[in-house]
Amino acid sequence: DLAILPDGEGNLWLGTLSALVHFNPEKRSFTTIEKEKDGTPVVLKQITTLFRDSHKRLWIGGEEGISVYQQEGLEIQKAAILPASNVTKLFTNCIYEASNGVIWIGTREGFYCLNEKDKQIKRYNTTNGLPNNVVYGILEDSFGRLWLSTNRGISCFNPETEKFRNFTESDGLQSNQFNTSSYCRTSAGQMYFGGINGITTFRPELLLDN
């Protein structure tokens, strides 16, 4: 697997099984990031997702959880914004920033929100109504609800009420099982989630509860 993220300057960040790599297409050059700006070794394993937030920080998720870095050119330096919690060490599949600035992280053991302002983490799993603890993708709709792809369908989560509305193959999904890094929302609000039997697409505002 390979995680890919444009750096905003025409180049690409690549997350591999063992390293963070910067690719310059014009020079056709690859640079492996081995140290932080202060000389601290960069040790990353099985990177599954790369994300840049509204503060231009680089988030890296994978086997060992998440790391956050301030980044300038090829220089990175860890940003001390993560609270001390074992939750941030869970195998991470996806990272998403909602319109209100709250960061949501999907893992193999549920998903959680990171409220940087309050330095708080709140975790949700099957005991809270999530259909499955493996969360592959997170997208926000125009109503502020979060849509999550899992190993047991798609779930719509309302952050205000903390309630889940779950959808399965019987509701028209391609399958109950979805894939890592296979999700996107268009500027028009159409959502796409990729799974083992194809793609499920829909407009959230057009879905009606029975």
Model-derived features: where do they sit?
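Carboxylate-rich, polar loop motifs that coordinate divalent cations or form catalytic acidic clusters
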Residues: D1-N210
